[in-house]
């Protein structure tokens, strides 16, 4: 969810839509000359057997679908059109869009779903194409790789800390020494270079270059700033590789700033490729929303205190203002409904009737803090940033509590997992780790329909967009993704996978298991999971739609399997994946974070078991609001939204298994509603052409050559 400086006010959407675009334009030429060796030949000569790619890369295999997709992308760029492409796993979609991008002679942003895919593009795919296009090494592609601002060091913050140390504990002192030494040598300021720095480092949060603490061009380190340097590299590049979070954070900042020239970090660009485009609705919704929390209140008062201590600007008046925000915030958030997790805040009006004085008192305390900061006689530039943050919190709090915007759902999320079981307790965000053990409370405002915003703020401003993923189509069409994203006019293409799914994979659905929603399901499902794992000799992901189901079945199987059992929550995701890869016959039990973006090739992963059709939790406030809006508009939310969303998630989960031509294995779905319910046909028709069975003996036969 967007936070201070990362989102734009939903209240301003209509005004923003009326204005001309100042952040995208029809065509931005390449900063260098078009790549003539690429532009001088038809695409077929690159991809064909005996073509340029196969000559430079002996392991390259011709894939007709890859050529087909590449031609479609080239046409979209040439004809200034939008394009939606589902490219099955193994298509080679990154090369399929990279080559026409290079040939186009235009500046193009490539936005990916994950940092891992960014790294693959920048460190593997682009260099491979470069070697093929320029075998003599006489030319270089102009490419840059950008992450979110919080990945980069703020030199000013580091130097301020050097002058006025505010460190807590030996660990922070060690981290400070490592960062200070690294700052002298790094060219990028990217924290990924600091392998020894923990992901949840509290010190890094004090030193990162996030937008809400940035002084911009008024900063004395502006010229040497790593963000400034990143902007320069991007402005000089033809291909800019980002991730969806950075792209939409940047877009929301530009919308909020009304096109101010120094807003955001991405340069003007008329063409964008969205890889892993099935994630766009959720991510865009987060950045087009608002989040106000007790954590943000605490961070504001803490940052004000640190500045005043450093600059010796403390006055009794401002000390009182800080204390007032703290006390009023603590009281206000303690009065909010005490439900756990995510829940709709439908009782805002009743809440304000009962607690209006406390709400107004918190607003007034934020106003007073901003006013006291403005009254300081000597104001370093940081004061203006802090004043803006106080004012922004005040306005956002009023919006979340008072707005009647019909396209917005208002809800509350409690994080901190007080009293939660171990696996849940470890799934904390970096914000929560900074705040300690207490519960953090987030007041959220999220757009119900992202499509309207994207239609007006993005698609209508771009010359060309290409949306691609292995999981975009539902039932052989793109109606769902087009409607959810507001992309009314786009060419469509489905490229079949290069894999022979019918011989490489078998899909097994147990015919007699109870409904997954019943209490009897877990015990019987555990028995089926055990038998399947014995057939496959482990080597499996067992994926769940809930932590509770995962924990129950894991506990039932403990001591019954001879294979190493790994469970999400017992270690960081990266450590679990590495242990899975190096442990023969391991079984990994996981939830949503293992359903996508995970790649384990070869026999080590020979089985993926999914507990149930992955329908979104109907009580989730955002899901419930979208369902209500569709039904109120005369639609059928179950078939128009809930089923298609679950289809795409299921395709993602099953997509973990077959990652190469040599992979082979079992897909098991422990939910026979796919066979018994009318809507099950939509799932079946959307999946690849796996061999299918309800007979477990067929599974044994499939693995017959492997079973000793």
Features from the language model and the residues they span:
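A contiguous, basic/glycine-rich beta-loop/short-helix subdomain that forms a polymer-engagement track
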Residues: 205-240, 249-262, 369-513, 520-527, ...
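Walker A/P-loop NTP-binding motif
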Residues: 74-75, 94-107, 124-128
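Conserved helicase motor "Helicase C" RecA-like lobe of SF1/SF2 P-loop NTPases
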Residues: 545-569
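Conserved RecA-like P-loop NTPase helicase motor core
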Residues: 510-520, 570-675
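Signature of the SF2 helicase/ATPase Hel1-core->accessory helical subdomain module
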Residues: 103, 116-119, 123, 127, ...
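Walker A/P-loop
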Residues: 79-97
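Conserved pre-motif I regulatory segment
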Residues: 37-84
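A substrate-engagement module of RecA-like helicase motors
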Residues: 10-17, 23, 29-57, 106-238, ...
